[in-house]
Structures are given as structure tokens and as C-alpha cells.
Amino acid sequence: MGKMTTLPVKVKHNGKMYDISLDPSAKGLAFKQAIAEATHVPPERQKVMIKGGLLKDDTDLGQINARAGQTFMVIGAAGELPKAPTKPIQFLEDMPDEALSQAQSWRGGLVNLGNTCYLNSTLQVLRSMEPLQEALAAYTARVGASEGDASLVAALRDLYRDMGKTTEAVPPLVFLSMLRKLAPQFAETAEGGGFAQQDAEEAWMRIVQALAILPATTSPNDRFVPQYLSGTMAIERQCVESSDEAPTQLKEPFHMLQCTISSTTNDMESGIKDSMTQQLEKHSDTLQRAASYEEKRRIARLPAFLPVHFVRFYWRRDIQKKTKIMRKVKFPKEWDASALVTPELAELIAPVRSKMREILKERDERAKVRARAKGRPDEAAAVEGGALTDEQEKAQRAKEKAEFEATIDASLRSDAGCNVSGLYELVGIVTHKGAAADAGHYMSWVRKEPRADDVLAPPSTEWFKFNDDQVSVVPADKLDSLSGGGEDSVAYLLLYRAKTL
């Protein structure tokens, strides 16, 4: 049987008619999503009249026998509409070359749909992962036509695609609706009405859980999350009450490191180390009773993208609320994670780390020479100032990359999506402002990358600041103010990316 084509139908809502396409091969939810984009009535509020009753989310649209030109009646209150832009939205394909060049290095925001800053900030940081964009672009499932997480991943792909077409703010209507359908906690209402504020870390983990089904671009049998966002933790548990009991060894995956914050925590790495050594109580087969154990964790695999959660919220029984820890905790823009790994991994990454540092130092020195020679003809600069021409610099970098690759152990080279050096650079931050977890305001900060085709561009010194639909550019040193110490915006989720040449 040939593939069904979409049918042009009409939807009537509040006396207005809308032209919409209906895909007979999709589910009812897909049609509701299309209605939502036209009428701004969220799918969960819609009552779509069909013969015999109301359209359900899981109804096969092919079974309702829709006809081209048929009119569907829709009942439901529209959500609050985003304010109209002060100037017409200009899409990238309509821009002249010069404007397009500037716009390609700019990113638009996301419209706050009512206490959704937690989601907007999370989505902006997730978007900074280029391998994720590539994997989503190759994903073929459709919203509504697939079940569960597959539909959420498809909605994420469509949202990022729409964001890539314009520099204006985009309302994440469909993705938010899908998230609330799959995870009802994000549909909770506040005491005063409307949707409640949620935890950005919980939103991050739920989205990553859905992305576990996303194929990687390296192979149809591989998955994006295990390759790029999952590490391996080696765990040793030792009974402290019996020297006769042998320690237990095991390994398990992790998707995020926890930075616990105590009265003595001053920096991120010390907080992570504290979380990796725990005291616990469990049954001892040797002693035949409950006994105390010490659990030590070390990282056996470092992923290319490593999120760190600053555990700033804890439950206070006396007031029955989550309370925020305001303590100042510094975090690095560049980070060597080798102090957290197993001895075996430390031995493998040590020569790679040393070689990368050596090459980056030499490149930095050459960049200084190039800067001094700026504005002079290439030939003159090369002779008089010692600066390489662009072509010479590119050739030198190719040589350096080959030398670097030669230092990587075969086991690391074959592990697509791992960090081979242990060196990371900060690329994204979700911050929280306020004293309570269920209140306050989330924002995100994403490193502004140089143009992809400018291989000789110096490292970025600017960051995007995303405050929902408001986007600005700030210098990198502004990040130092996000360490905490007050009720202003403080780092809550950090995303580190493996350094590359």
C-alpha cells in the first residue's frame, strides 16, 4: 500500500477558520499538535469533535475517514500568547549574505509559556552539543506518529530546527506539551493557579532519559547518550567493621556528576570528590548483620560531554520545603578531571593530556606572533615577524593533530564519544536566582563559538546569556559572578565539553 498523503482540512475555533494539514498515517496527538500551532490551544485543553465523539491522542487518524476540505470543530481555551515582535521576523533564508553571516553566530531565545524558565534554560544548554544536533537531524520519527520518548525526541528535533531558522524567540509549545504528557510532574499547578515552577536538573535528566533511544551518527546500532553523555563509575565497597571481608568491586554508568556543598566546600572539584566517597550501612555476609561500609567511586570512562550538578537544594523537615544553599563555590572554565579517574584510566590519558597541553601552548605562542603581525602582508609577516601564513598555520595544525592522534591508546581511539585527555572546557551553565527550589528564576549561559569555517579563530571570550526570550552577549569574566554567596543567579548545572584540537 502506498504512503498516504496529507489532507487539507479546516479547523473552526472561536468563530475563526484555520487551514491545517491532516496526516492519515499519524495519531490523533499529531493532529492536535498542528491545531495547537494554529490556534495556540494546548493539546491537553483541546476537544476535537469527530464522528462518534471526541478525538483521542492515540486514535489512528486513518480510521476517522477524514475528507479533504472537511471542517473540524475545536473547543478549548488558548494559552497566553507571546507578545508580537516589534519588527517582522526575518528568516535566515531571506537574509542578504552580510546579514546572514552575522546571524549565523547569533542564537534566538525561547518564549516563557508560564513558569517554564527551568525548561528554556535547560534546552539552550542541551542545544550547545553539536553531536546531539547531528544525531537529531538524522532522526526520522514524527511527533504523534511515534509513541512515548520517540515522540518527545522528535519534538526536540523539530524545536531545534525551528530555532535554527530564525534569530527571534520561539515558543516551545509542542515540546512542552509532549513533556507534560510523558512526565506529569511538569504539569503540576501552583497554589495560585497556572503551572508550577520546576527543577531544571529534573527536566535535564528526563530529557536525557528520552534521548537514550536516539541513534548516534557513527552507527545505527550505537546510541547518542551512551556514547557522548555517559561515563562509567568504578565502585569499591569495603566493610569497615571486618578486615576479613573482601571489598566488593562493580561498575555502573552515570550521566551527571554531583557537587555536594558542605560548610567547607569552596570549589567544584572538592564537592565532587566529597560525593564520591560515602559512608553507608548494609548487610554483611561475613558478620551476618548490618554493618558500616565505605564506598569509594572513581571514573573509569570520561564522556565527551560531562554535566555537573551543584546540589544546592535540600529538604528541611521543620518547614517542609526545599531550601537553597547559598554558599559560594568556584568552578573552572577549563578543567582537568584526571584527579577523579581510576589509576588505569589515569595512565592512559596522561600522555594524551601532556601532548595536548604542549600543542595548545605552542598554538597560543604562534597566535601572539600572528596578532603582532596583523595588518601586514602575509609574506612580509612571515619573514620579519616569524608569523606563519594562513596556509602554513593550517599545515602545521594538521601535522600537530597527527602527532596528537599517535599518542592516543587504541582502546580510547576506538571508544567513540569518550574524552581521551581528561581535559574539559566549560560550554554551558544553568543558573538559579532566588531562595526556593519551587520559585525563583532560571537562566542559561552558553559559550559563543567562532564560525565553524574559521579554523584559525582564537578561543571564544564571549558568552550568550539567555533570559527566556531575551538574549544578550556577555564577556567570559562575567561567569565569575555566578559562583554564589547570595540570592542572585548562581551556577546550578554546568556542562563541560572535552577539549579538542
What are these regions (language model features)?
Residues 2-501:
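UBL (ubiquitin/ubiquitin-like) substrate-recognition surfaces
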